[in-house]
Amino acid sequence: MFTPLNAAELSDLVRSTVAEGAALALHSGNSLSALGHPPRGDRPHHSLSLAGFDTIIAYEPDELVLTVGPGIPMAEVKSLLVERGQHLAFEPPDWGPLYGQPAGIGTLGGTLGAALAGSRRVTAGSARDHMLGFHAVNGRGEIFKAGGRVVKNVTGYDLPKLVTGAFGTLVALTEVTVKVVPAPETVETLMLPRLNPALATKLMSQALGSPHDVGSAAYLPASVARDLIPGTSDSATLIRLEGFAASVEARAAALMADLGVAVERLGAGVSRTLWQALSDAAPLVGLHEDCLWRISVPPTEGAAILEAVQAARPLATGWLDWGGGLIWLALPAHPGEGDGGAAFLRGLVKNGHATLIRAPERVRTAVPVFQPMPPALAALARRLKASFDPHAVFNPSRLGA
């Protein structure tokens, strides 16, 4: 495994790998190594760890900007921000345990590379929206930078968005700059019990569209709710409010009056644990034999898909987040089906993306892990890859063909 400690070493490594005709499998914390397609073909693949780029380069709390190496653990980032009453608004999840890894080993670089975001993404935006700039080495071994360290900077602004979510297929990051924001003083969750997915989606949409500054909304079937919420045995529709205590109290009272249904309040302690568990997909961690899927759709379509899955696969585990726009699913093995449920699920998803988050390697080798792109978009993606990495040295198989 190669572990360069600076951009010059990384540049030399990329150039020598290109000359060898080999490829580099990028990672930092290695918590997400089983997400995506495994390496393919006879081409040699060398492991490239960016864990050596793990320093805090600049933190300017008053400017709401943090610059660090991509190998810095997310746990260290969160601890640093908590000291100044700040956080990353897109709520980075910890998916390591989904892959049998210890909690807390994920890095900021891995989080940005996979564009991971938690339940608050529906209102706060994605990881891509909080990435301001980066330094990197491209597939030619050239050192370059894009974006900057100020929130209003626009120079090279599109490149940070392109790199975020590229799964290390375009560049090898050496430095990242992200936007941080003040953390809320407190949190409250309104729980609406015993609703079906369709009515839950309607009320989540009402809450998210209200003037009460709702932060996130999710629907949990009874099988999921009872494992996460003490004393609950029915389905739970959850609406999160955050901010100053007096504001949260006033908004909670107003929203409860507007919704016109039975509402229970969970309190700050339960709320913090609950929303972290949903962001981390914690209810699926122990389902080791199931294939895990994450489906992004228009919020109005999530309930129907979840109900269709529940009807056809009664042993499946799943819930709605992002106000109905995100579906988490765990599918047990199905007789005569070797694709982890890909054909079944993608047949249900007409306007969205179904991503195979976890499956055995044989399934990830045979099935598109990521939603297949339309031909024109796939051609654009190939041109983008060629412009950054003409020799396909970085994670050439990670996103598929």
Question: Where are each of the predicted segments found?
Answer:
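C-terminal substrate-binding/cap subdomain adjacent to the FAD-binding core in PCMH-type
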Residues: 132-289
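General beta-strand structural signal in soluble alpha/beta enzymes
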Residues: 2-4, 24-28, 48-49, 68-70, ...
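Hydrophobic alpha-helical hairpins/lids featuring a short glycine-rich hinge
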Residues: 95-125, 129, 135
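Structural signature of FAD isoalloxazine-binding scaffolds in flavoprotein oxidoreductases
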Residues: 33-54, 69, 120-140, 172-175, ...
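Glycine-rich N-terminal segment of FAD-binding domains in flavoprotein oxidoreductases
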Residues: 2-95
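Conserved glycine-rich FAD pyrophosphate-binding loop
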Residues: 37-43, 49-51, 98-99, 262-401
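Short, conserved charged micro-motifs
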Residues: 75-77, 197-202, 245-253, 301-308, ...
